[in-house]
Every structure is written in C-alpha cells, then in structure tokens.
A protein has these predicted regions:
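A short acidic/glycine-rich loop-to-helix N-cap element
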Residues: 197-211
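Short, gly/Ser/Thr-rich active-site loops of penicillin-recognizing serine hydrolases
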Residues: 113-117, 210-222
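Beta-lactam-recognizing serine transpeptidase/beta-lactamase-like catalytic domain environment
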Residues: 1-195, 205
Length: 222
C-alpha cells in the first residue's frame, strides 16, 4: 500500500512524492530478467574509465534472488550500490536524448561530447522522465519544490540511502541526495548538479540537501 495520498497513481506522481511503493511494484511488474538487462545496459557491473579508480555500481553479485530483493531494488535499496559518478553519468542521458556522456574530472575544451553509452533510453522515455522531474521541483507537493527558482527550467529527483547493518537496525544513518539538471539557456551552459550529504536522518532527510542545492543554483545563475 502506498504511503502517499494522491489520486493518480502514475510515474509522474510517484516521482513528485518519491513514492517507494510505486517503484517496488514497478520492479515486480518488470521482472528480474528485464530489470537486470536494463541495469546492465546502464553500465552496472562495469568499471568507469575515470581519472582515478572507482568502484563499479552493483545490484548484487547473485542478481535478484527473491521478489523482496527485486521490489526493494526498485526504489534503490536491497543490494543496490550505485557509484555517485556513475549516477551523474546516467542522468546526463536526460539532457542528451537518451545518450550517457562520459564523466571527466577537469573541464577542457573539446571538439565534441565524449559518449559513454548511446541510446540507453528512448526519446519517449527521456521526455516522460524529464517532465516528471520538472514537476518534482515545480509542484508544491514535490520533494524538490524547495529548490524551485521562478523562471528557471530545473528538473530533479531526491533520494535517501539508508546505511545500516540489517533490516532491523534502527541506529543506522542516512545519506540524502538530490540530482538537479538544467538545460542550456541563452547565457548558461547545461548543468547537472549531484548533491549528497551524510547523516541527514534527523535533519530533514533529502529535504536538507534540496535547500542547500537551491543556494548553489542561485549563486550559479547570478
């Protein structure tokens, strides 16, 4: 049963309210084989060619061994381990018609974008998710609404990573994160900002990160 009271149970509202139950059900509907194939397509289990060594993102060495694990993985828990740099690369696809860009540490003048993986999402999927992320910030009920800046096309998604030893561990901490993307404007290049803060359990969860992100964006846009 969903924990959020909203009328239309679809992807857009699930994104707006960050509804874990919706995504758990979606994972079960998709099934473990398609879930695995799509995560592999995004680069899970692969090392990133980066300036320094990075751990590969993973959904567990044995795959999805139960429906419970599959459902939990649908909203980023279970055995999901996502490298933040890899996460940033995945989100670049929503600014590049479904193609992931290769991340690098130092900005240099380049003749063209360096591509990590082409066409990981269809253009239809990109448009659908972009509109949902836009509403995460614009909608007054959105978990990212505190980052809304009037007249600026910001899109985002909040998240919370639980750090605990077991399902019954009540003393574990939480990492709050917020990914924000902004298409290119007349005077600013396209931007993606991935903000992560440790130990947000008693500081408002990912909402703490959203407020910090708005300050950064306002400074950038001056």
């Amino acid at each position: 049963t969903t924990l959020h009271n909203y009328n239309r149970h679809d992807l857009q509202n699930a994104m707006i309210y960050s509804d874990n139950i919706y995504f758990a059900k979606a994972a079960l509907k998709i099934g473990k084989d398609i879930m695995k194939d799509q995560l592999d397509n995004l680069g899970f289990g692969e090392s990133l060619d980066f300036t320094f060594g990075l751990n590969a993102s993973s959904y567990g060495s044995e795959g999805f061994t139960s429906d419970i694990q599959l459902a939990d993985s649908g909203y980023g828990q279970g055995k999901m381990m996502v490298n933040p740099v890899h996460m940033a690369a995945i989100y670049t696809a929503f600014l590049n018609d479904g193609t992931m860009l290769k991340p690098y540490l130092i900005k240099e003048k380049r003749s063209k974008k360096q591509i990590l993986k082409e066409n990981v999402f269809t253009k239809e999927a990109v448009n659908t998710v972009n509109e949902a992320m836009r509403q995460v910030i614009r909608d007054s009920s959105g978990t990212g609404h505190a980052a809304n800046i009037e007249g600026v096309d910001l899109r985002g998604k909040t998240g919370t990573a639980e750090i605990k030893q077991s399902q019954t561990d009540t003393k574990g901490t939480e990492i709050g994160w917020f990914v924000t993307i902004m298409p290119a404007t007349n005077n600013k290049e396209a931007l993606e900002l991935v903000s992560m803060t440790e130990n947000v359990k008693k500081r408002g969860g990912s909402g703490y990160v959203v407020n910090k992100t708005k300050k950064i964006m306002e400074e950038y846009l001056q």
